[in-house]
Amino acid sequence: MKKVILSVSDKSGIVDFAKSLVGLDYELYSTGGTKRALDEAGVPVKSVSDLTQFDEIMDGRVKTLHPAVHGGILADRDKPEHLQQLKDKGIDLIDIVVVNLYPFKETVANPDVTEMDAIENIDIGGPTMLRAAAKNFKHVTTIVDPSDYDEVIEHIKNDSLDETFRKSLMIKVFEHTNDYDNAIVNFFKENKEPLRYGENPQQDAYFVRTSDAPNTIAGAKQLHGKQLSFNNIKDADATLALAKKFEEPAAVAVKHMNPCGVGVGSSIEEAFQNAYDADSQSIFGGIVAVNRPVTKELAEKLHSIFLEVVIAPSFTEEALEVLTKKKNIRLLEVEMTVDHDEKEYVSVSGGYLVQDKDTKTISRDDMKVVTKAEPTEEQWKAMELGWKVVPSVKSNAIILSNDHQTVGIGAGQMNRVGSAEIAIERAIEINDNVALVSDGFFPMDDTVELAAKAGIKAIIQPGGSIKDQDSIDMADKHGIAMVMTGVRHFKH
């Protein structure tokens, strides 16, 4: 019978996965909390101590660090001498290793974390098993990501758990352990950068880097300018996240954590001009991110206005010559790749919240036209642009957009109509090709009625209100095309 070791901190999906393995005639071995979870769910599982014939010691610090575990994982099954040594020592082969590590990043994200808390969340046995199994990917399947559970089961059922698939899992493992080790290094280097002050001058602050990945603000390469402030860092992070959403040339301007202008175009220069024209007043003193290299032509446009920070994947030498004439402007070089599995953390009194970042994307095929009127192609493009932007706007959020820029943004109001009124009032244009975009459903039809009075002919919103039909009827009354996505994008 083939053997599996399971030892996971993130227990999402582990019970169903374990049940599937048992159904496929695998014998399960586990440790600590994972074994308790499986026992409570009635899944047949043995203790790793049954393999090692050695009890856990030192409060669980030593559980799997044993030849009976690592011999069974590392044995090269193409070498008869390896198999003979296992037989001589009474060691069984291990075919699948399922491990994810102690939550070190989550632990050190707590501002009140102690060094001892951090130390106790440094995993030793987990990375050792992962690396051993990944090294032997020709013979052993290694799973570090719960999202791979279903695919692994399908491969087992289809007898396609081959070396190519195992190699793809191996790559994930080494990426994961590398990121894990970097987080530990960065924490214990005491990578706490004192800041001049926090959100306000009366607040002390510092910047703790838990990653130096080149696609993050923490890992950004600062090419010029003063030290980033607390508010610069927060705004820069929000600006970067939004710029990464676009594949076409795009420019994003942010003030106080809210976009004030977003533009796309056939060139990065055109995209920035569209973003600037979206709100040429609010961009003053803001932060701009572009997802293409900054050219001399773009640099001259940027140089003509006061900006705190410019973020880009790179700057040409000519662009730097222009921009560095301003002593204080911060220039950040950051990769524009997206990490879909990122977490975000929010401190609350007595603890902190952890959630996945809101990176869900949808296509037209996922959207539903609910009105008699169908959107035109121009309206579809306007809705798609606005739908990328609206998750970055404080709720309640209403955006007006065309196919190449935001034209009005209403953010952070306590009722949706209030945000719509602001977006309409500040709009640089309203015509048949402008769409109204809402981050949440309409509890009543008043926002649709307001849009109709303003001359808006296309709306996109999540839907899901018990009064959706009232909004649909109001849209039909005024010949408005309305699309529902089934996805909400609140931002607090």
Curated annotation (Swiss-Prot):
Q: Which keywords accompany this UniProt record?
A: Hydrolase, Multifunctional enzyme, Purine biosynthesis, Transferase
Molecular function GO terms recorded: IMP cyclohydrolase activity; phosphoribosylaminoimidazolecarboxamide formyltransferase activity
PROSITE patterns, alphabetically? MGS
Q: Which GO terms describe its biological process?
A: 'de novo' IMP biosynthetic process
Report domain MGS-like positions.
1-144
Protein's UniProt keywords contain Protein biosynthesis: no
Which Pfam families does this one have? Answer: AICARFT_IMPCHas, MGS
Kindly tell me the pathway this chain contributes to. Purine metabolism; IMP biosynthesis via de novo pathway; 5-formamido-1-(5-phospho-D-ribosyl)imidazole-4-carboxamide from 5-amino-1-(5-phospho-D-ribosyl)imidazole-4-carboxamide (10-formyl THF route): step 1/1; Purine metabolism; IMP biosynthesis via de novo pathway; IMP from 5-formamido-1-(5-phospho-D-ribosyl)imidazole-4-carboxamide: step 1/1
Q: Which reaction does it catalyse?
A: (6R)-10-formyltetrahydrofolate + 5-amino-1-(5-phospho-beta-D-ribosyl)imidazole-4-carboxamide = 5-formamido-1-(5-phospho-D-ribosyl)imidazole-4-carboxamide + (6S)-5,6,7,8-tetrahydrofolate; IMP + H2O = 5-formamido-1-(5-phospho-D-ribosyl)imidazole-4-carboxamide
Give Gene Ontology CC terms: cytosol
Q: Recorded E.C. number(s)?
A: 2.1.2.3, 3.5.4.10
The text the record gives for the protein's domains is: The IMP cyclohydrolase activity resides in the N-terminal region.
Family classification: Belongs to the PurH family.
What NCBIfam families does the entry give?
PRK00881.1, purH
| Annotated protein name in UniProt | Bifunctional purine biosynthesis protein PurH
Which species is this record about? Staphylococcus carnosus (strain TM300)
